[in-house]
From Swiss-Prot:
Task performed by this protein: One of the primary rRNA binding proteins, it binds directly to 16S rRNA where it nucleates assembly of the body of the 30S subunit. With S5 and S12 plays an important role in translational accuracy.
Protein name: Small ribosomal subunit protein uS4
Stretches assigned to the S4 RNA-binding domain: 92-152
InterPro entries registered for this protein in UniProt: Ribosomal_uS4 (IPR022801), Ribosomal_uS4_bac-type (IPR005709), Ribosomal_uS4_CS (IPR018079), Ribosomal_uS4_N (IPR001912), S4_RNA-bd (IPR002942), S4_RNA-bd_sf (IPR036986)
Biological process, per Gene Ontology: ribosomal small subunit biogenesis; translation
This protein's encoding gene: rpsD
Subunit structure: Part of the 30S ribosomal subunit. Contacts protein S5. The interaction surface between S4 and S5 is involved in control of translational fidelity.
Coiled-coil boundaries: none
Region (Disordered): 22-42
UniProt organism field: Geobacillus kaustophilus (strain HTA426)
Length: 200
């Protein structure tokens, strides 16, 4: 399955979460596309709830189904809780951490910055969005890319930097200091439903 590249507001409304991080797409019309007015949402089956939760997390991180499933299976081989490990692996993606550092307004924008070679990891250019950053590694904007308007606008937005990251705005450089705890990851996701979905 290919990665979805259409309007994110449609997906946000369908799943009932903000994928842009601003919440604007849910303010005006907080009901699914195609539904004329804020009527009652159709009650989902157990399978439907599990599928919806999987889609929420997959679209949140902008991962295609093949990568998503592969990461899920990898998380199952790690010690600890399967669902929690899965979310930590997704959070450790380079494109996500570029977004978390406030260098991009959205994960989609962060993915483009990585793909176009604007991001360094420990001083070396990495253009793979799914690259897994390890604790202690440094993420920085390439010197030639520091005047990019999209990066300047993102930094001006004063985004919240999670406690598992440190960031120096003058150097446009941050460090992934440690793995996040579950309480620091998206609260609107019930990862147990995703584990149930893939365990069927």
């Amino acid at each position: 399955m290919a990665r979805y590249t259409g309007p994110m507001w449609k997906i946000s409304r369908r799943l009932g979460i903000s994928l842009s991080g601003t919440g604007k797409e849910l303010q005006k019309r907080p009901y699914p596309p195609g539904q004329h007015g804020p009527g009652q949402r159709r009650k989902l089956s157990e399978y439907g709830l599990q599928l919806q939760e999987k889609q929420k997390l997959r679209h949140m991180y902008g991962v295609n189904e093949r990568q998503f499933r592969k990461t899920f299976e990898e998380a199952g081989k790690m010690p600890g809780k399967h669902g929690e490990n899965f979310m930590i692996l997704l959070e450790s993606r380079l494109d996500n951490l570029v977004y978390r550092l406030g260098l991009a307004r959205t994960r989609r924008q962060a993915r483009q910055l990585v793909t176009h070679g604007h991001i360094l990891v420990d001083g070396s250019r990495v253009n793979i969005p799914s690259y897994r950053v390890k604790p202690g590694q440094t993420i920085a904007v390439r010197e030639k890319s520091r005047n990019l308007q999209v990066i300047k606008e993102a930094l001006e937005a004063n985004n919240y930097i999670p406690d598992y990251l440190t960031f120096n705005p003058e150097k446009m450089e941050g460090t992934y200091t440690r793995l996040p705890e579950r309480s620091e990851l998206p609260a609107e996701i019930n990862e147990a439903l995703i584990v149930e979905f893939y365990s069927r």
